[in-house]
Swiss-Prot record:
One of the primary rRNA binding proteins, this protein initially binds near the 5'-end of the 23S rRNA. It is important during the early stages of 50S assembly. It makes multiple contacts with different domains of the 23S rRNA in the assembled 50S subunit and ribosome. SUPFAM superfamilies: Ribosomal protein L4. Belongs to the universal ribosomal protein uL4 family. NCBIfam families: rplD_bact. One of its GO terms (biological process) is translation. It comes from Ectopseudomonas mendocina (strain ymp) (Pseudomonas mendocina). Coiled coil: none annotated. This is Large ribosomal subunit protein uL4. Part of the 50S ribosomal subunit. Residues 38-73 are annotated as: Disordered.
Length: 200
């Protein structure tokens, strides 16, 4: 299949990478797994068994007229433990490399199908100036955009850092969440070749 390049001749790309079917279930699984992997999960509360003290029963079993109590660290006591105490846990979800790559191929194919993928010959700014980057993006009619190049350009990264709706990634730093989060994805021809190399 062919991909149109902005201001240049169309390029031939692999059907397997850019022309496949959209697998919503797989993409959803990849997004959930990616976001779960970013969770810290270091919460912690103490249950009745974790709270210090409470070994001695507060009063005898019978004869006081009060409800029986074996410890002062039960959940209904002040200073007691939490009923269903949260504990530190690992939220990671396993996703096979083959499935992850298939999800990325599916996303790229959908971006092409919905005209959200903009391909350019090259994209760079001479200095790390936000104004210069905005001018280039406005020239292409782009506002909410992810810029993907084959390698991170420091000037481009610094110029985009202060723009809330613009992000810069290299091909290997692209993930399912960032690829679907923006209105448009701007890729260079070299990045397209790199995607084919990694996902083909």
């Amino acid at each position: 299949m062919q991909l149109n390049v902005n201001g240049a001749q169309a390029i031939e790309v692999s059907d397997a990478t850019f022309g496949g079917e959209f697998n919503e279930t797989l993409v959803h699984q990849a997004v959930v797994a990616y976001m779960a992997g970013g969770r810290q999960g270091t919460k912690g509360q103490k249950s009745r068994s974790d709270v210090s003290g409470g070994g001695k029963r507060p009063w005898r079993q019978k004869g006081t007229g009060r409800a029986r109590a074996g410890t002062t660290r039960g959940p209904i006591w002040r200073g007691g433990g939490v009923t269903f105490a949260a504990s530190t846990r690992n939220h990671d979800q396993k996703l096979n490399k083959k499935m992850y790559r298939a999800a990325l191929r599916s996303i790229l194919a959908e971006l092409v199908r919905t005209d959200r993928l903009v391909v350019v010959e090259d994209f760079a700014v001479e200095a790390p100036k936000t104004k210069a980057l905005l001018s280039k993006l406005n020239g292409l009619g782009l506002n909410d955009v992810l810029i993907v190049s084959d390698a991170v350009d420091q000037n481009l990264y610094l110029a985009a850092r202060n723009l809330p709706h613009v992000d810069v990634r290299d091909v290997q730093g692209s993930d399912p969440v960032s690829l679907i989060a923006y209105e448009k994805v701007l890729v260079t021809v070299s990045a397209v070749k790199k995607f084919e190399e990694l996902l083909g």
